[in-house]
Amino acid sequence: WHFGYKAHIGADTDTGLIHTLETTAGNVSDVSMTSKLLTGTEEEVNGDAGYVGANKRKDAITRNKFGKKIKYRICRRPSTLKKLSRSGQYKARKAEYRKSSVRCKVEHVFGVVKNLFRCRKTRYRGKAKVDSQLKMVFALANLFLADTRYGLQA
């Protein structure tokens, strides 16, 4: 049998620390989890191409708790860049580079979890057990990242 799970995370762009974790089956799309990952205090949302159209969904959160409009900065799919003219491609690639430089903070957390804590494959069968394992590992990753970035001392 084959089974897989996804860890959808919401991370703070300033600190790079995780504030939300949702575990789903592997066949659940990223864009369907967007509203569950937001805390309500965001001013902008950054995501990869898997989140295209997140602001147009029925369950999309368009305003934060303070009434300000949330800016969705989602990377474009590479195939849409090929359709542009040469000068348009140059400008679009620069804009995509700026978006992905913010998004790399989230990807860095996944690198810590996979490489430092060796959490590459699921060790359990069942969503509840996998969810518990991922919450523990991501909490440890938060502690590790906070310690390396801010030098927290006991």
Question: Regions from the language model: what does each represent?
Answer:
Residues W1-T62, K68, R77, V137-A141:
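Polybasic low-complexity intrinsically disordered regions
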Residues D14, R118, F144:
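Residue-level marker of positions within ordered structural domains that often coincide
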Residues K36-T39, K129-V130, A154:
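Short, charged/polar low-complexity linear motifs in solvent-exposed/disordered segments
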Residues E43-E44, A49-S132:
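Helix-centered, glycine/charged polyanion-binding patches within enzymatic domains
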Residues L116, R149-A154:
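A short, flexible helix-boundary coil/loop motif
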Residues K135-F144, R149:
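Aspartic protease catalytic domain
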